[in-house]
């Protein structure tokens, strides 16, 4: 059974909970993680790149020089791909769709594997739901991370929108803030430490059930 500690904003342990087994897998599936991250990366490619083919380049309709008696290789147009300023052979066109489909089973397996990987490496910590600030305070978040001895990439996962917590995290270059339903497999893998609120963890369990 995997247990994690829930910390408050001062870095003190308030509770220890047992992670629901529906959130974990017995073995981390690296291929599922790879497929999920690849699909996410490819989905961000707009596909608006475009090049001109030989027939689309302006000018150069005239034969550069006569066919014979020049001692040079015959040429039909300066729009040919091997000419500077000529068309591009087999260049990209904007009608290409880079997106690949990952079915729900693999996507779910990838998410669980990412969580399991973080738990196994002691990179998954909990935060209490009752984190409330009167105003944004970068100093408070920096102090929390110092207490937890976390000085690398941190992902804070909230169960509901918390503007003060979000703004407090925004000024720290190594800290990112996301709502539980915005977190992807890539977000989990990229982070060196995941700090998730208790209700955010429960929401993940319900979604994966």
UniProtKB/Swiss-Prot annotation:
Entry-linked InterPro entries: Ribosomal_uL4, Ribosomal_uL4-like, Ribosomal_uL4_dom_sf
Gene Ontology molecular function: rRNA binding; structural constituent of ribosome
Residue runs in coiled coils: none
Any Pfam family the entry gives: Ribosomal_L4
GO cellular component entries: ribonucleoprotein complex; ribosome
UniProtKB keywords: Ribonucleoprotein, Ribosomal protein, RNA-binding, rRNA-binding
A Gene Ontology biological process term: translation
Subunit structure: Part of the 50S ribosomal subunit.
Functional description taken from the UniProt entry: One of the primary rRNA binding proteins, this protein initially binds near the 5'-end of the 23S rRNA. It is important during the early stages of 50S assembly. It makes multiple contacts with different domains of the 23S rRNA in the assembled 50S subunit and ribosome.
Protein's name in the database: Large ribosomal subunit protein uL4
Originating organism: Mycoplasmoides gallisepticum (strain R(low / passage 15 / clone 2))
Lineage, uppermost ranks: Bacteria, Bacillati, Mycoplasmatota, Mycoplasmoidales, Mycoplasmoidaceae
Gene: rplD
């Amino acid at each position: 059974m995997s247990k994690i500690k829930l910390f408050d904003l001062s870095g003190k342990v308030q509770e220890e909970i047992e992670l629901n087994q529906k959130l974990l897998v017995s073995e981390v599936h690296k291929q599922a993680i790879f497929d999920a991250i690849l699909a996410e990366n490819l989905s961000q490619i707009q596909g608006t790149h475009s090049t001109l083919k030989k027939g689309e380049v302006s000018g150069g309709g005239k034969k550069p020089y006569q066919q014979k008696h020049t001692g040079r290789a015959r040429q039909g147009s300066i729009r040919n791909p091997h000419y500077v300023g000529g068309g591009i052979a087999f260049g990209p066109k904007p009608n290409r769709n880079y997106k690949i489909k990952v079915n729900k089973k693999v996507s779910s397996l990838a998410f669980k594997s990412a969580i399991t990987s973080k738990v196994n490496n002691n990179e998954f910590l909990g935060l209490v739901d009752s984190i409330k600030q009167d105003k944004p305070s970068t100093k408070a978040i920096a102090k929390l991370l110092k207490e937890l001895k976390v000085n690398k990439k941190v992902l804070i996962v909230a169960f509901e929108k918390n503007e003060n917590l979000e703004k407090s995290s925004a000024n720290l270059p190594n800290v990112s803030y996301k709502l539980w339903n915005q977190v992807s497999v890539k977000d989990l893998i990229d982070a060196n430490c995941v700090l998730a609120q208790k209700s955010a963890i429960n929401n993940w369990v319900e979604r994966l059930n």
